[in-house]
Amino acid sequence: MSFDINWSQLVEDESINNSIKEFLASQFSSVSLPSYIDNLTVSDFSLGDKAPEIIIRDIGDTFEDFYEDEDGPRNAGAPTTTATSGMGESDSSDDEDTRDGLTGEVTLSETTESKTQFAPQPLHPIPTKLRRSHTTSAATPLSSHAHLNSLYAYNLTNVGLGTLNLNSATPSGRDTPTQILNQMRTGPNSPPISNTPISSSKKSKRGENDVQIIAEVKYKGNLHIEVTVDLFLNYPSQHFVTLPIKLHITGFEIHSLICIAYLQNAVYFSFLCDVSDDSQADYFNGAHMESGGNFVEYVSGTNNKERIDIIKKVKIESEIGEVETNVLRNVGKVEKFLVEKIRSIIREETAWPSWLCFDMSD
């Protein structure tokens, strides 16, 4: 099997950048803003030209949860034929052979190949529709709580490079993300896995080309988000001065385990857990916060009590011109506010049991 990922061709497609930009804009539009800012908009987005480092940890059947999402109105009467997204496909027998024989790591960067090759499908058309699919807000409190409890039970926040065992049994669609990761853990004292048989209705929905990849992704690139916002000076009176500022958010660092599922006419994406690095930093490094600084770094670390951070590090550069010191301090507040909201949005919308769906039916 061969995977050929042309990152430069992917990021040059404006439909991808625009879809993500619209997604972020819709999320920010629903955020409750503090009294000192208004008119928060996402003015630009770019994936950047630096590709992430990807190591495939497992290839298997897709999670049942994705088929529950396929039951929605979007897929009523939808055909089971697959669309192209830059990843070639082999026949079903080749897929099974590859899954059974996967015992090592496959590293992907900008272009990756393995020994057995097949003709890749053309990169275009690329999906132009980014759908918000299953999220924790759509699930019942009990079901969301159950998902999180299972992840806590296996301490997935601290999964590291040495904790994955590719010689374990090949996972199937009956497995949850927690069970997948548990099967790849080393150590004789790992708790047993209790699987529930797949229902006949779920089996009937599976297409012969449906496939799921569990991969470790490490990203330290130049993804760029441009945000414009009006900053208010509320002294000596409310909204005494309105100052438009532009913020460039970049320097994202991510090291996580992800799930990518390809089924029928859609690609599903979800972060499963963070992968621990050798060194960790403080939750926030706000050394430049008081001065505004025009350049601030924010680092998340082990002090964060959330299950998953996803974004380990991010930088913000502000364009405000020559202004007074008290204005710079307010800009520092805006920067910190944006970082917290971006991390929250990414975590809530893309971390399991939430996911993003790239609708390829159009």
From Swiss-Prot:
InterPro entries named among the record's database cross-references: Mdm12 (IPR027532), MMM1_dom (IPR019411), SMP_LBD (IPR031468)
Predominant location category: mitochondrion
Membrane topology, record value: Peripheral membrane protein
HAMAP family the record matches: Mdm12
Disordered: annotated span: 65-141, 170-207
Keyword terms: Endoplasmic reticulum, Lipid transport, Lipid-binding, Membrane, Mitochondrion, Mitochondrion outer membrane, Transport
One Gene Ontology biological process: mitochondrion-endoplasmic reticulum membrane tethering
One CC-aspect GO term: endoplasmic reticulum membrane
Limits of the SMP-LTD domain: 1-361
Role summary: Component of the ERMES/MDM complex, which serves as a molecular tether to connect the endoplasmic reticulum (ER) and mitochondria. Components of this complex are involved in the control of mitochondrial shape and protein biogenesis, and function in nonvesicular lipid trafficking between the ER and mitochondria. MDM12 is required for the interaction of the ER-resident membrane protein MMM1 and the outer mitochondrial membrane-resident beta-barrel protein MDM10.
Subunit structure and binding partners: Component of the ER-mitochondria encounter structure (ERMES) or MDM complex, composed of MMM1, MDM10, MDM12 and MDM34. A MMM1 homodimer associates with one molecule of MDM12 on each side in a pairwise head-to-tail manner, and the SMP-LTD domains of MMM1 and MDM12 generate a continuous hydrophobic tunnel for phospholipid trafficking.
Subcellular location: Mitochondrion outer membrane; Endoplasmic reticulum membrane
Protein name, UniProt field: Mitochondrial distribution and morphology protein 12
Recorded domain comment: The SMP-LTD domain is a barrel-like domain that can bind various types of glycerophospholipids in its interior and mediate their transfer between two adjacent bilayers.
One example GO MF annotation: lipid binding
Family to which this protein belongs: Belongs to the MDM12 family.
Keyword Nuclease listed: no
Polar residues: bias regions: 106-119, 170-187
Chain intervals with Low complexity compositional bias: 192-201
PROSITE patterns for this protein: SMP
